[in-house]
């Protein structure tokens, strides 16, 4: 079943990771996908692709307007562009704090505010933002990342309140640890114990796949979720449900 037949979907962060998985899945489900990222990947399924730094509001607006001219008005937006960061509140410097907040939170806002007006004018649409379990439950030594992703959750709910009367649904996904280029540095060296700890905290005993997050994004983007808005959906293998003691049944 093509759940996004005749829909136009804009996916940010579409060059890799969760964004790329969303672009592939949405294309498979019948959407014309417009990709947006810092670089154009060598291979992608998108009907059109543009480059922009989501921190640059003018560049975002120009890129989105160009994509709309090429593929048509946007029915679905997936804000998947993002970066990770480690550091406590007293050790992270101003530049890194700004980088993480500007990409993860301000970048989400930059794209959403351009796209949502067209959705309102056309009578509806669906926005899916990428937050994180760390936007719900603060993680150790991730002060900027936690703040940014928590902001994405509340930006999502704020937009759901404001645009619900216009039939624009706004939801977010809160993934756990997902096997992407962003988490690849955790697979080697002194950060590997962090990856192993996260894996063990997932009740399903493994890290997630980008395709699993894309499947959840598809649900929220499609009419299958036609009565869902303002929701933060965990795709976390049970991470937020609770903790288990080692060696117990």
Task: Report the location of each language-model feature.
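Alpha-helical segment proximal to the catalytic Tyr-Lys
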Residues: 117, 161-165, 226
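Residue(s) in the substrate-gating loop at a strand-loop-helix junction
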Residues: 132
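Active-site loop immediately N-terminal to the catalytic Tyr-X3-Lys motif
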Residues: 90, 137-143, 165-166, 205, ...
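Substrate-binding pocket helix/loop in short-chain dehydrogenase/reductase
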Residues: 88-89, 93-101, 194, 198
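C-terminal helical subdomain
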Residues: 172, 192-224, 228, 235-237
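Active-site helix of classical SDR
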Residues: 112, 148, 156
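Short C-terminal tail/terminal secondary-structure segment
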Residues: 137, 218, 229-249
């Amino acid at each position: 079943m093509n759940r996004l037949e005749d829909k136009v979907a804009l996916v940010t962060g579409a060059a890799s990771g969760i964004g790329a998985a969303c672009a592939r899945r949405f294309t498979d489900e019948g959407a014309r996908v417009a990709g947006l990222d810092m670089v154009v990947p060598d291979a992608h399924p998108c009907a059109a692709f543009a480059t922009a730094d989501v921190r640059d509001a003018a560049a975002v607006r120009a890129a989105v307007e160009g994509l709309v001219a090429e593929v048509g008005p946007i029915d679905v937006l997936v804000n998947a562009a993002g970066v990770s960061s480690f550091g406590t509140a007293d050790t992270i410097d101003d530049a890194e704090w700004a980088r993480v907040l500007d990409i993860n939170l301000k970048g989400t806002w930059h794209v959403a505010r351009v796209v949502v007006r067209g959705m309102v004018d056309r009578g509806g649409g669906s926005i899916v933002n990428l937050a994180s379990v760390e936007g719900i439950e603060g993680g150790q030594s991730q002060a900027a990342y936690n703040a940014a992703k928590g902001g994405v959750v509340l930006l999502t709910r704020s937009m759901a309140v404001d645009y619900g009367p216009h039939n624009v649904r706004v939801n977010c996904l809160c993934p756990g640890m997902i096997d992407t280029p962003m988490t690849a540095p955790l697979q080697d060296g002194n950060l590997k114990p962090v990856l192993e700890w996260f894996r063990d905290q997932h009740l399903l005993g493994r890290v997630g796949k980008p395709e699993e997050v894309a499947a959840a994004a598809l649900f929220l983007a499609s009419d299958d979720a036609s009565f869902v808005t303002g929701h933060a959906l965990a795709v976390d293998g049970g991470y937020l449900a609770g903790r288990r003691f080692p060696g117990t049944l």
